[in-house]
């Protein structure tokens, strides 16, 4: 990687470190997502403890954190491998944010945003997988884990030059969901629409 690419990856990390869930909850007067619900600062938990508008705002912002640096990297002349590492940097920032004691979200929305400029076919396959599993199961976490397991194969098929960095991103996503995997195994994971059934 070039020196510029390393600094640009650092920029992507810093951008990823801006936790939209925490900031939007503060602005909207909602509880701290790190201390309520699933204790995860992400769109799903904001939906759980707050409302749809706030959750949608978090989702869009988190996707843009991954999409903007990778998209801009194309126009800055970064190589394909460097673009993949920039995507990794944005996801690392979201998962381990320097501005919030390195305790961040799961990284799914940021990973989707980062992968979209790399390959719309991969992003579409990832989104389709997530939606299918979610509609069948109702579990956001299970949808994310299965998507993360399959995305490296999608990348290998459509854009093989990005397989290594994207596989690293997917390993991060699976690692970040280890608590969810245990709850799924024990049958203790909440379905997303459980909140609306209680109303």
Swiss-Prot record:
<keyword id="KW-0812">Transmembrane</keyword>
<dbReference type="InterPro" id="IPR003811">
    <property type="entry name" value="G3P_acylTferase_PlsY"/>
</dbReference>
<comment type="subunit">
    <text>Probably interacts with PlsX.</text>
</comment>
<keyword id="KW-0808">Transferase</keyword>
<dbReference type="Pfam" id="PF02660">
    <property type="entry name" value="G3P_acyltransf"/>
</dbReference>
<comment type="pathway">
    <text>Lipid metabolism; phospholipid metabolism.</text>
</comment>
<keyword id="KW-1208">Phospholipid metabolism</keyword>
<feature type="transmembrane region" description="Helical">
    <location>
        <begin position="4"/>
        <end position="24"/>
    </location>
</feature>
<feature type="transmembrane region" description="Helical">
    <location>
        <begin position="80"/>
        <end position="100"/>
    </location>
</feature>
<feature type="transmembrane region" description="Helical">
    <location>
        <begin position="154"/>
        <end position="176"/>
    </location>
</feature>
<dbReference type="GO" id="GO:0005886">
    <property type="term" value="C:plasma membrane"/>
</dbReference>
<protein>
    <recommendedName>
        <fullName>Glycerol-3-phosphate acyltransferase</fullName>
        <ecNumber>2.3.1.275</ecNumber>
    </recommendedName>
</protein>
<keyword id="KW-0472">Membrane</keyword>
<keyword id="KW-1133">Transmembrane helix</keyword>
<keyword id="KW-0444">Lipid biosynthesis</keyword>
<comment type="function">
    <text>Catalyzes the transfer of an acyl group from acyl-phosphate (acyl-PO(4)) to glycerol-3-phosphate (G3P) to form lysophosphatidic acid (LPA). This enzyme utilizes acyl-phosphate as fatty acyl donor, but not acyl-CoA or acyl-ACP.</text>
</comment>
<feature type="transmembrane region" description="Helical">
    <location>
        <begin position="56"/>
        <end position="76"/>
    </location>
</feature>
<comment type="similarity">
    <text>Belongs to the PlsY family.</text>
</comment>
<keyword id="KW-0997">Cell inner membrane</keyword>
<feature type="transmembrane region" description="Helical">
    <location>
        <begin position="115"/>
        <end position="135"/>
    </location>
</feature>
<keyword id="KW-0594">Phospholipid biosynthesis</keyword>
<dbReference type="GO" id="GO:0008654">
    <property type="term" value="P:phospholipid biosynthetic process"/>
</dbReference>
<keyword id="KW-1003">Cell membrane</keyword>
<dbReference type="GO" id="GO:0043772">
    <property type="term" value="F:acyl-phosphate glycerol-3-phosphate acyltransferase activity"/>
</dbReference>
<keyword id="KW-0443">Lipid metabolism</keyword>
